[in-house]
Swiss-Prot record:
One of its GO terms (biological process) is carbohydrate metabolic process. Belongs to the glycosyl hydrolase 18 family. The keyword Secreted applies. One of its GO terms (molecular function) is oligosaccharide binding. This is Chitinase domain-containing protein 1. It comes from Xenopus laevis (African clawed frog). InterPro entries: Chitinase_II/V-like_cat (IPR011583), Chitinase_insertion_sf (IPR029070), Glyco_hydro18_cat (IPR001223), Glycoside_hydrolase_SF (IPR017853). Residues 1-19 form the signal peptide. The keyword Electron transport does not apply. Keywords: Lysosome, Secreted, Signal.
Length: 393
């Protein structure tokens, strides 16, 4: 506990670092962990009494790969559930196939759209598209929609200005997206663009996204928009996407993937997603609950490992987390205020560390909150967590 207090004290002297869905360059390296075999169980984690604040390291080590095979198609979340999959984490592809029926939407992080010149657009990343995997998903769950993430990659400020000032540019941009979806047999797209302008040009972005949404809907395609948190992490300040923009876009957006994670950073160590902050981010966007079912509350399946030396930290995935539990046998501590577990351990020469990583209990609390608020869930990302997490969905 002393270490955690030290980390949080150090954090207050550092500036805010904003979060984006694609803030995963550091997570890419961490994702390349050795895969472990899953095990099957006749009972769910709920029935085994594992969803608890009083969780033991040894129980996680023993049970984390054991999910209930009998209830793979049984859903506990009534609203939409979106799961992200990344090309650099092969286990996520397997998780998506195994638990496909628990997801209404699966988004593979494959694509970029680039502006090649005047009224000329190209969708790249198509070499990553795995049609066999898509076929397997649809075979397992006919109702699950495949909606790849598409990122506005390599765009200059002038590129955005050119599009904002021309309806023809917008039409060509939207047309390239629609044609790609038809060619590749996608069900729609998750669009990530809002954070790239740092909160500037909001009304121009709204205008662009309304046109994209109308074009996708005309082709009977889903439109999911990634949005940053309504309250800037680590502050009481409003974020770069607020209620005004939400109300303008809600009629043409099918779902909003809300980034309620990455609350802390190596420069500002602490919890991944304090529960009160998560709740505030939803309520500020839609205080009257008019469009709540369109909000997908962001849920992280990765954690952070912070060092007391030099205010450093790195992402931590399931395999590494279990290794720490095995090696150090730490006590897991539950913080009721943030609704997260954390642990502390000491490396031989690396000093003291604090780890915030999701547990069955922290996930269940957020699923309960989503149910209470009337929202869905968006998980970043499949394969980073522990296999028994999916019993909860």
């Amino acid at each position: 506990m002393r270490l955690l207090s030290t980390l949080l004290l150090v954090a207050t002297t550092y500036p805010l670092i904003s979060a984006t869905l694609s803030k995963t360059d550091s997570k890419k390296a961490a994702s390349k962990a050795p895969e472990t075999k899953t095990r099957l169980s006749d009972t769910s984690v709920q029935s085994r009494g594992l969803v608890s604040t009083d969780v033991k390291a040894k129980d996680i080590v023993l049970e984390h790969r054991s999910y209930c095979a009998k209830k793979l198609k049984e859903r506990h979340v009534s609203a939409d559930v979106l799961g992200y999959v990344t090309p650099w984490n092969g286990h996520g592809y397997d998780i998506a196939k195994t638990f496909a029926a628990k997801f209404t939407l699966i988004s593979s992080v494959w694509l970029q759209i680039r502006r090649k010149g005047r009224e000329a657009y190209q969708v790249t990343g198509l070499h990553d598209v795995d049609q066999g995997w898509i076929k397997d998903i649809r075979k397992t769950s006919k109702s699950t929609q495949i909606v790849p993430r598409i990122l506005f990659d390599g765009w200059s400020y002038q590129d955005f200005e050119s599009v904002f000032n021309s309806e023809d540019e917008i039409e060509e941009l939207a047309g390239a997206m629609v044609q790609t979806a038809k060619d590749e047999h996608f069900d729609g797209f998750v669009v990530e663009v809002w954070s790239q302008l740092g909160g500037q040009k909001r009304q121009e972005l709204v205008h662009l996204l309304i046109h994209i949404g109308e074009a996708l809907h005309s082709a009977k395609l889903h439109f999911i928009l990634v949005i940053p948190p309504a309250v800037a992490p680590g502050t009481d300040q409003l974020g770069m996407f607020g209620r005004k923009e939400f109300d303008q876009l809600a009629p043409v957006v099918d779902s909003f993937s809300l980034m309620t994670y990455d609350y802390s950073s190596p420069q500002r160590p602490g919890p991944n997603s304090p529960i009160s902050w998560v709740q505030a981010c939803v309520q500020l966007l839609d205080p009257e609950s008019k469009w709540r079912k369109k909000i997908l509350l962001g849920l992280h399946f990765y954690g952070m490992d912070y060092s007391a030396l030099g205010a450093t930290g790195e992402p931590i995935l399931g395999n590494r987390y279990v290794e720490i539990l095995k090696e150090h046998k730490p006590k897991l501590l539950w913080d009721q205020q943030i609704a997260e577990h954390y642990l502390e351990y000491k490396k031989n020469k690396g000093g003291k560390h604090a780890v915030f990583y999701p547990t069955l209990k922290s996930i269940q609390v957020r699923l309960d909150l989503a149910e209470e608020l009337g929202t869905g869930i968006a998980i970043w990302e499949l394969g980073q967590g522990l296999d028994y997490f999916y019993d909860l969905l």
